[in-house]
């Protein structure tokens, strides 16, 4: 049997599938004939950047992927790490950027559903979700609509499916005005004897289709996700999938039950490219072929043709390879959970994907041509940094107005440091994200140890809901926990992709260390503009180089992730405007004892406040800072350089201090610098602080000391009873890289920052700080709603 070959496709038809003319020529060469419509669509989605990483794959080879705890690295549905005691953690991050731009609710909701399937396809029960979100200015009505829709979609799916959303980050910047980013990370605890892989095997083994029915929703979603957005993208709403979280909940339980029978040889969820991707990837990974009959596929719409079946991205669907003779056992399980389950195909020896329809062959393509031997572009890297970066690096603080202990003159008016602190706390990127968190069910499953916003990373207790075969003890260690975080400062990466990406890894590890967790491994989500433009490719290549170095330096191997390119929006003149390069790092860490962790809020009056890392007298530039962008409307300079030796020592000291019971609170200095970190500790603990700084006017600007970022800095508080042993430990392990800042006060104290000669730099009440910080987002949304 062979597929039929119609006449040539027009250049427009080829381009509509996301293929270049030279790629179409390569398809014809490989097939020895012209493809038919269904085959053209299959190549279009599988050769899209979203599926085959044709521009990024050469760069990803730099990433470290091996380590003593790595059980599954890149190439499977999710990475898996060994937590000890027989426990294994699956985790992964994925993007749903383009769908969320045109249909924010369903785009975000199905992003949650898709990443959950990646987790339970491995044989792991999902235990937590995090998200990393980017939007334009929150003053803009369109941004507010996208923001509210995305948050509603995430909360709807996560809440209904019963998986807690335990943390994340939200940034606002005009660079994302037309192209929001929605990255979702999921964690799962392995429940099966063996990790479920995706490579098909066993000639003659049946191929099962399970889950929901197939419709026309999500048609060509992978190709849609690999193109720039424009005003016409709203017409691509059919490319956005529609999810059913209640059906997914049943699918989770049915799949885990099925895996435990031992009857499943391999499994693959139907995400991007649907049936096309699942059949071709399973066949290619197993070195076999799959023959699938579309007439067996449960359809929710009539009159569907092979092209539609093969490219549909209808949600909550899976493909299994079962042991021959045990298929009915699996079908019965899925029927009991109210789900579809049919034998739709067979594993064959010939390494092809053969699609049958109405008694004929609808498509026949070598599996490797679709899933492994895909196009690869080794693009030329710019010989030197682009002009925008070189100009930005020329910035110096000399261009800023002079400042004193009283404040700084901005646009003809004097602003006190109180004014500037409150302005920064009111900035949506820095402000509390409680407007977001309160819409999420973050305590379902009852294993969330710290509520979102209460610490620098999420902490989840590892309490198996089902018996785990590999447990060394039948009585699980209920003190064992994991921490997780998602991080990226895109302004850093825009201004210096290499140094900025290193800083992303360092901050993620620092956030884990602030709750007492040992960083273990990374999953990354690379969100960039077009790699076909020299600047876009330079940003991508340099960021990958920085991520690779950061992960090697901090011994956090990469277990997999996602690449989302072509994040650009056509402006009114039709010129593509790219987002800031945004390599989001999702990192997980191990907590031996969840009774020994830290939040970021002060714990008791009289505790001593320390700054770990570079002392405030150290010269750190304001370049790339939130202060420079918000207060001076300037995006320039270089991000803080990362000293990995100092990072390792500071983070280890923080973790040991927490485990020994010396440290009572910990919070890293990030956006907004030490002043914002101090304010956040006051707000979280509802306790003030009195800080004394030694100001050397000839050496340091006041704003540099207060608002500069970087320096591997962590604020910790220690009870005075532990002060002597703690300082002895600090002296031994950090030398001079720490200082005492002051003491924790009470609520009435507020935040007071003084010079050693008693000049007041900052004196502001907790009530004022909390009002700005806690209501910044809600206030903007309410104002816009009232106006409209």
From Swiss-Prot:
Binding site for substrate: 95-98, 117, 241, 313-315, 564
Family of this protein: Belongs to the FGAMS family.
Active site feature: 50, 96
Binding of Mg(2+) 2, residues: 118, 269
Pathway note: Purine metabolism; IMP biosynthesis via de novo pathway; 5-amino-1-(5-phospho-D-ribosyl)imidazole from N(2)-formyl-N(1)-(5-phospho-D-ribosyl)glycinamide: step 1/2
Protein keywords: ATP-binding, Cytoplasm, Ligase, Magnesium, Metal-binding, Nucleotide-binding, Purine biosynthesis
Compartment(s): Cytoplasm
Official protein name in the record: Phosphoribosylformylglycinamidine synthase subunit PurL
Reactions it catalyzes: N(2)-formyl-N(1)-(5-phospho-beta-D-ribosyl)glycinamide + L-glutamine + ATP + H2O = 2-formamido-N(1)-(5-O-phospho-beta-D-ribosyl)acetamidine + L-glutamate + ADP + phosphate + H(+)
Residues reported in the UniProt entry to bind Mg(2+) 1: 94, 562
Gene from which the chain derives: purL
Binding site for ATP: 53, 92, 524, 561
UniProt function note: Part of the phosphoribosylformylglycinamidine synthase complex involved in the purines biosynthetic pathway. Catalyzes the ATP-dependent conversion of formylglycinamide ribonucleotide (FGAR) and glutamine to yield formylglycinamidine ribonucleotide (FGAM) and glutamate. The FGAM synthase complex is composed of three subunits. PurQ produces an ammonia molecule by converting glutamine to glutamate. PurL transfers the ammonia molecule to FGAR to form FGAM in an ATP-dependent manner.
Molecular function GO labels: ATP binding; magnesium ion binding; phosphoribosylformylglycinamidine synthase activity
GO cellular component: cytoplasm
EC number: 6.3.5.3
Principal EC category: ligase
Quaternary structure note: Monomer. Part of the FGAM synthase complex composed of 1 PurL, 1 PurQ and 2 PurS subunits.
Pfam families, per the entry: AIRS, AIRS_C, FGAR-AT_linker
Signal peptide limits: none
Biological processes per GO annotation: 'de novo' IMP biosynthetic process
